[in-house]
Amino acid sequence: MSDITPIEIPPLPQNFHELNKLVRELGTGAETSTEDAKIFTQMAQIACNYLEHQPTLSDQEIKEIHASLIKSCVQKIIELTKEQPFPEVAKELRGISTRFALLVCLPIAYQNLNQIPQKSSFVDTLLFCTLNEQTPLSSAPNSVRSFVQKYNSDPKVRETYDTFKNKVISLRDSWVQGVLGETIFFRLAQEAELNPQFSSPQKDVGAQHVDYYITCNDKKIPVQVKSCQEGNAIPTIQKDFKGRLLIKVNASPNWLIPSQEEKLKQALFPSPETVNTFFALVNEQLSYYHNP
C-alpha cells in the first residue's frame, strides 16, 4: 500500500503502563491509599527521568516526526477498519492519542521545565490529567492534591503549569486532528476506488508538500490534505496552480470523546451518498486537470 517507512509510536515504557493502570484505578473514585500515592509519586519520578533524557528537537525535526507518525497511524487505522468493528478502531485511536501525548508532546513541552521546583509533583499532576482527563482531581493521589494546593495559591506556579499543559494538549490535538483528517480522506478515496497511495516522507513537509496520490482515468494526481474543524462530511476540493488537489477535511479531536463517537463512526465509515458526492467533486476538479 505504501513505499514509505514511517516512524512508529513506540509502545509505552513499562513504567507508563503501570502508571496508566494506576490512574485508571484511581479514576474510579475509590479512596486512594497511602501506598497507591507512594507508587504514583515513584512513577512520576521515573517519568521525569525518562523525559529529561529525550533529545532536544528543532521545529523542522518535530514537523518531520509529526508527518511520519501521522502516516504510520493512518496505515494502522486503515487496516483496522478492514478487520475490526468500529469500537475497536475508536479504542485504538484513543490509545494512539495517549501514547503520542506521553511520548512526543510531553518531552517537547518539558524542555522548558528545568527551573520548575518540585518537578516530580508537577509532572505527576500533568500525567494524571493527561491520562485521565475525565477524572476529578478529588480522586487524585495525595501528591497531586498537594500540587493543586500550590496551583491554587501561587500565581507563578499556576501560570507555568497552565502554559505547559496547554502546550501538551495543543500539540496532541493538532496532531490527532491531522491523523483523523488524513484517515477520513483515505477511507473516502478507497471507497470511491481512487486507489489512494502514500507519498514519500520527503514530500510530506516543505514547499512541495504532497501527502498522497490518487489515480483516476490512468492519471496519478498529487494530493495535499488539510484537516480543519469546520464544514460537513463532504470535504472541499480545489486544484492549485501546481496541479495538486487541495482537500480540506472536517475532523475534530473531540470525536475521540465517547459521547461524540457517532461523528467519528460516520466519518470513518462513510455512507454511499457521501462517497458518491466526494467522487463527483474529485472528477469535477480533474476535468480541469492537465497532466504535465
Regions found by a protein language model. Give the residues of each.
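Active-site metal-binding core of divalent-cation-utilizing nuclease and nuclease-like domains
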Residues: 198-208, 215-217
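Intrinsic-disorder-driven secretion/translocation and chaperone-binding regions of pathogen effectors
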Residues: 1-4, 288-292
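Nuclease-adjacent, charged terminal/linker segments that flank catalytic cores
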Residues: 1-149
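Catalytic cores of nucleic-acid endonucleases
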Residues: 225-289
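A short acidic (Asp/Glu
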Residues: 209-211, 234-235
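Conserved catalytic cores of phosphodiester-cleaving nucleases, focusing on short active-site segments
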Residues: 185, 189, 212-214, 221-227
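Short basic alpha-helical hairpin corresponding to helix-turn-helix/winged-helix-like nucleic-acid-binding
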Residues: 139-150, 154-174
